[in-house]
């Protein structure tokens, strides 16, 4: 089982490593495609030079952490990542609202539609007695266990003899 797990993890890592890089998930240091214009690279290079020049004129000492994360300000985040999406599935209906906690605390929206009541509220099942307990054991008619009984009535109503010792 562990060998299968290791194999799947290695296959996953190889797949990620061999996947082609797109412009969306590429780090700043490695371009994804060779058609990136030199002007954009030159602009970022000039911006870095000017920021370094302004930093050199300031008398405040810089920490090593600030120098490492100085280029992190140029990261652009796609606004599509933060949009709320409604999930769709052919088999499951995803609701945009949480189900009500109890019948008394239901909101007016759920009470307006009878279909939503049927879909969201479940009826509790009644507790059924278990009928098959001890069906292979010997039991007297008054439900008292006896050890010295030699005959019994089976499920179909036939008289059967009870074996005292069972050989394995």
Curated annotation (Swiss-Prot):
GO terms for cellular component: axon; dendrite; extracellular space; synaptic vesicle. Expressed by the venom gland. Keywords: Cleavage on pair of basic residues, Disulfide bond, Glycoprotein, Growth factor, Metalloenzyme inhibitor, Metalloprotease inhibitor, Protease inhibitor, Secreted, Signal, Toxin. Gene3D superfamilies: Cystine-knot cytokines (2.10.90.10). GO terms for biological process: cell surface receptor protein tyrosine kinase signaling pathway; modulation of chemical synaptic transmission; negative regulation of neuron apoptotic process; nerve development; nerve growth factor signaling pathway; neuron projection morphogenesis. Pfam families: NGF. GO terms for molecular function: growth factor activity; nerve growth factor receptor binding; peptidase inhibitor activity; toxin activity. InterPro entries: Cystine-knot_cytokine, Nerve_growth_factor-like, Nerve_growth_factor-rel, Venom_nerve_growth_factor. Residues 1-18 form the signal peptide. Glycans are attached at residues 25, 148. Residues 48-70 are annotated as: Disordered. Nerve growth factor is important for the development and maintenance of the sympathetic and sensory nervous systems. It stimulates division and differentiation of sympathetic and embryonic sensory neurons as well as basal forebrain cholinergic neurons in the brain. Its relevance in the snake venom is not clear. However, it has been shown to inhibit metalloproteinase-dependent proteolysis of platelet glycoprotein Ib alpha, suggesting a metalloproteinase inhibition to prevent metalloprotease autodigestion and/or protection against prey proteases. Belongs to the NGF-beta family. On reduced SDS-PAGE, the determined MW of this protein is 18.5 kDa. This is Venom nerve growth factor. It comes from Echis ocellatus (Ocellated saw-scaled viper).
